[in-house]
């Protein structure tokens, strides 16, 4: 008998993903084989499974919290917005098509059978499934074809816990309004509420909790405080939070350009965790003034974001910063932008466009998407701030639909091992001031990250740090801290009871 519980929210970014990861960690600590599941995820942060399938980063870090290898079945449908009106539809880890919102809404009913089959296959292998909804179940305009909130809860026949964010204000109205907009059979599935992100004396909430419980008949299972834990965020909404403003004084400042279609900003979590590094996401040219390194991150619409760089003045600012001797790095879409030319007949239909010209390279987009985990070795000789990283092993993953060919004056940055073959990747200039790669997750390689940060320290006349920060151990500690806080502030025994009362045979 498989047990399951689903976290749904009163809105986006209320903390569902993190609390789901915390439940995965708790059940893992308690000896239960646990898997996360989100039927449909809309995010530009994605990752690659060991078998080369693309899935949402949220379910990847939830799987890590549960002590298991990420499996694409944990996120069978991934939507990656390419513009305000279109998204790339990824089914079971592979690109299916591009659709606008109306077309996808009409298409969703066809996915129900596949989603349920995938869910049931997971349920046969695990003791507990922790499901996560998307946005809010009270989107009444989408109810009839829902496959991710109450529609998924109905398919899985599982109880629901509603998560509400008190930090944004109006928490009791959000709880009451969400429950009021549900149909009775949907409301009956909601067995508890968690109030999340509270700051202050919880005693001030007691009278409100009593009233909301009386009004709705749904118990509040706990009040989670605002936690100082370093865990991944699912989407770009999180870039507006204090966590990414980077005001704390540190020896090294790294400026990451916040592109309109930024993807995989989880690439920089390991950098942000370094004790001597401050990262800042920037959108204004003047914010580049104190940067020791500028990074152009991944993008889901490379040419559109390149046009934004020029229109906003950021392109000129990046080039001026580079002329002043500050290194500029690009990852995936950012790497493509650093080149001389981009030929795109696939993603944007804009044809041939000039890049920023910092790397003598030409990128041509293709229909087929490369999705693979890889081991790599940095080139044996690297210039400037990258010198200490020469020859180091690194790991990462590729998600791209283009091929970049180097021209005269560019050297290969690293060699990938793919299907038993050595494949060149990335580019670096002779002075090391421009460096690009397709490899996401590069900074999760501890020795590489410490080497390049020490290279930046040396440029400022600072003593290198001899101690290497272990990011994997750091993440494990964060999962344990989250689980400890949830055990302290949430009635976990009640959640066990809720699951046991509603467990279903698979």
UniProtKB/Swiss-Prot annotation:
Q: Where is the active site?
A: 332, 440
In its keyword annotation, does this UniProt entry include Protein biosynthesis? no
An example GO biological process term is: cobalamin biosynthetic process
Asked if the Swiss-Prot or TrEMBL record annotates the protein with the keyword Ion transport, the reply is no
Gene3D superfamilies per the UniProt record, alphabetical: 3.40.50.880, P-loop containing nucleotide triphosphate hydrolases
**GO MF term set:** ABC-type vitamin B12 transporter activity; catalytic activity
Q: Which UniProt keywords apply?
A: Cobalamin biosynthesis, Glutamine amidotransferase
Metabolic or biological pathway, per its Swiss-Prot or TrEMBL entry: Cofactor biosynthesis; adenosylcobalamin biosynthesis
According to the entry, every stretch annotated as the GATase cobBQ-type domain falls at 251-448
**Function recorded in the entry:** Catalyzes amidations at positions B, D, E, and G on adenosylcobyrinic A,C-diamide. NH(2) groups are provided by glutamine, and one molecule of ATP is hydrogenolyzed for each amidation.
Q: Which family does it belong to?
A: Belongs to the CobB/CobQ family. CobQ subfamily.
HAMAP family, A to Z:
CobQ
Write the protein's name: Cobyric acid synthase
Q: Which organism is it from?
A: Salmonella agona (strain SL483)
Write the gene name: cobQ
């Amino acid at each position: 008998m498989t047990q399951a519980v689903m976290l749904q929210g009163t809105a986006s970014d209320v903390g569902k993903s993190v609390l789901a990861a915390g439940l995965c960690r708790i059940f893992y600590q308690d000896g239960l084989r646990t898997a996360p599941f989100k039927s449909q995820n809309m995010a530009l942060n994605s990752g690659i499974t060991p078998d080369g399938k693309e899935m949402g980063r949220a379910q990847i870090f939830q799987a890590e919290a549960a002590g298991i290898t990420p499996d694409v079945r944990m996120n069978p449908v991934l939507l990656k917005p390419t513009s305000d009106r279109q998204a790339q539809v990824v089914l079971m880890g592979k690109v299916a098509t591009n659709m606008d919102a109306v077309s996808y809404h009409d298409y969703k009913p066809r996915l129900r059978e596949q989603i349920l089959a995938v869910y049931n296959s997971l349920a046969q292998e695990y003791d507990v499934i922790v499901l996560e909804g998307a946005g809010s179940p009270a989107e009444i305009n989408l109810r009839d074809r829902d496959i991710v909130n109450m529609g998924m809860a109905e398919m899985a026949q599982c109880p629901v816990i509603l998560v509400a964010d008190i930090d944004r204000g109006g928490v009791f109205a959000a709880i009451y309004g969400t429950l009021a907009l549900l149909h009775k059979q949907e409301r009956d599935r909601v067995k508890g509420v968690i109030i999340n992100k509270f700051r202050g004396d919880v005693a001030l909430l007691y009278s409100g909790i009593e009233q909301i419980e009386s009004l709705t008949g749904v118990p509040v299972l706990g009040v989670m405080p605002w936690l100082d834990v370093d865990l991944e965020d699912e989407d770009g909404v999180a870039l507006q939070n204090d966590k990414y403003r980077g005001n704390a004084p540190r020896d090294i400042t790294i400026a990451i350009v916040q592109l309109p279609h930024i993807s995989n900003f989880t690439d920089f979590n390991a950098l942000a965790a370094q004790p001597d590094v401050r990262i800042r996401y920037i959108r204004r040219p003047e914010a580049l003034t104190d940067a020791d390194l500028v990074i152009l991150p991944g993008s889901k619409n490379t040419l559109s974001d390149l046009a934004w760089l020029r229109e906003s003045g950021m392109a000129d600012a990046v080039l001026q910063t580079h002329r002043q001797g500050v290194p500029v790095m690009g990852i995936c879409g950012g790497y493509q932008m650093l080149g001389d030319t981009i030929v795109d007949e696939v993603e944007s239909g804009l044809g041939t466009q000039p890049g920023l010209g910092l790397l003598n390279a030409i990128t041509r987009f293709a229909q087929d998407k490369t999705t693979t985990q890889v081991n790599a070795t940095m080139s044996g000789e690297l210039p400037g701030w990258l010198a200490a990283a020469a020859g180091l092993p690194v790991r990462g993953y590729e998600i791209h639909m283009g091929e970049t060919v180097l021209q005269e004056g560019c050297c290969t940055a690293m060699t990938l091992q793919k299907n038993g073959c050595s494949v060149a990747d990335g580019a670096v200039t002779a002075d090391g001031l421009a460096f690009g790669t397709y490899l996401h997750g590069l900074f999760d390689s501890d020795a590489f990250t410490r080497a390049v940060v020490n290279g930046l320290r040396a440029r400022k006349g600072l003593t290198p740090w001899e101690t290497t920060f272990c990011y994997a151990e750091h993440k494990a500690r964060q999962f344990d801290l989250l689980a400890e806080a949830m055990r302290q502030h949430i009635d976990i025994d009640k959640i066990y009871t809720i699951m046991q009362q509603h467990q279903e045979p698979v």
